[in-house]
Amino acid sequence: MDNRQQIHLENLSLRYRGIETSALKHISVDAEFGHVIGIIGNHHAGKTSLCRALAGIVPTIISGDVTGTIQVGSLSPNLDWQKYNQQTGVVLQNPAGQLSGLADTVADEIAFDLINQGVPADQIKRRVLNVADQLGLGDQLNQSPGTLSGGQKQRLAIATAIVTDPSILVLDDPTSEMDPLGRQHFFSWLVSVEKKTIFIVSNEVDDLCEIADQIWVLKAGELVAAGKPLTVFNHLKP
């Protein structure tokens, strides 16, 4: 397979500064670019650390040592962080923490990165309305972000991540604060997303299996299974 159409992790390890134990240990796996990769595992399995590595957050923002290879299509955070970052949308576990804090309204928050990129005003308005509609935030565009519920803030974080049209999405438990209807809407939306490579951590395993092309299972920082959902869960059965 052309490596520009492949996700390739080889011997990936991550250790945070000041912590002796590695959070990720020698992970090697391949998948197809443009697929949805579901990441599951128990508490402290390394799911968030893998998201941070895939997003390039470690070591550029959070101090740590990353060794091995991360290649997502033609992009790699190891080789060109700036170019990789421009094509990557990230949603962290704490959605409020990744909002700018500078926007008066939900619409302004969604538009924040587009404004910084110098996108024309008419395009900004169109793209903001589009992603707000996709994520069920159309009625909240004139509200202050601080007035939103936890689930709405998660949807706002997703909106800010996708409005720049990245080719890679890294979503770390993006539905943890959503109610059942919100989660259902999110996974229905995710099915409709095209031409993006999506890495998603979720405890909603049944929903994840419905939409994921591959499941990666982590345990104590190691990859213990990877493959199509049915294959993986048959393998994990006692």
Predicted regions and their residues:
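Conserved beta-strand-loop-alpha-helix hinge in the C-terminal portion
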Residues: E222-P238
